Amino acid sequence: MKVTKGYADYITFLFDDEQGSPIISNLLKEEVLIEKCICRVVDTITGYYEKRIEIKDSVILRLDMYAAYIYGGLTITNSVIGYFRLMDGGYNREPIIIRNCVFLGEVDFDESVLKNDIIIEDCIFLKGHDFVEDIRYAVMKEEYFKVKI
């Protein structure tokens, strides 16, 4: 799934089988790329993401990844995010990489379980970085915690 160069009011990841029948399994098997977009809301819906989700060079008012199992990992680079929630999810088999971003609002990792590296570098958090303790509790091994704020 690829969304590039433009404005989208609402992006959500819907699940269906090969015949287009509605939600049989909530496993998305393809990579997701959101690039050079301006979007009001990106909502992952509760689901399982086998491949990497990548957001780059974008502006997103609300990035809501509630109960998203991001097995393939997540990369957010060179973007401005209003509100970001990765809550009650995680379970990443691949790294979560957040680099060169500006976060305008709350950042929420509450109740996530992180099973691989989480790398946060060169980001600005206008509402502070209280969420760092949530990440520290979420990582399954201390060496996965690679946050430089």
Segments from the language model and where they lie:
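N-terminal leader/targeting and pre-domain segments
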Residues: 1-149
